[in-house]
């Protein structure tokens, strides 16, 4: 158990490093999105780091189960470091996978499955990740600008559920159009009441 505990602690330290890199990449993309200069490489940079964190955290799960009650503190630490990484990856895919309009569930599920099955060696190449999202995969295309649909930003507003985000994205198309909309315009989207529209508009203002 002593050796296993040492290994588990070392693995947690690695996950901590990945979490730090995810947070930095996430902040970088968020700022780029809000200022309209997000590029393909920013998206792939974040996705790569998210997947590394997700895989590293899963690798520790079995060790923690084996250690049982001795690993209670490590279990809490891992849970905190993992955060909502699965949902975060899904929202990033929803924002940037290439398709017309709102990406349907089968497309998202397929992309998430493909990302899970991606060999570790491909995880470190931008081209492999780009292809799974339908983004341009060549070196010179990495600086191409991209606009998110708005899933990641809208999901950061308290109590805004994904089905509401789907309707808003369906109505407006992308984050720039959503941010430019007045509350009464947001309320045109299906299932978005005037009250919700004001809440969302206020949330977007706070995040800007």
Regions inferred by a protein language model and the residue ranges of each:
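Long, charge-dense, solvent-exposed interaction surfaces that engage phosphate-rich ligands
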Residues: 38-41, 45-58, 62
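Long, highly charged, low-complexity intrinsically disordered interaction regions
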Residues: 21-32, 47, 51-53, 65-189, ...
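Conserved phosphate-handling catalytic cores of large alpha/beta enzymes
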Residues: 2-42
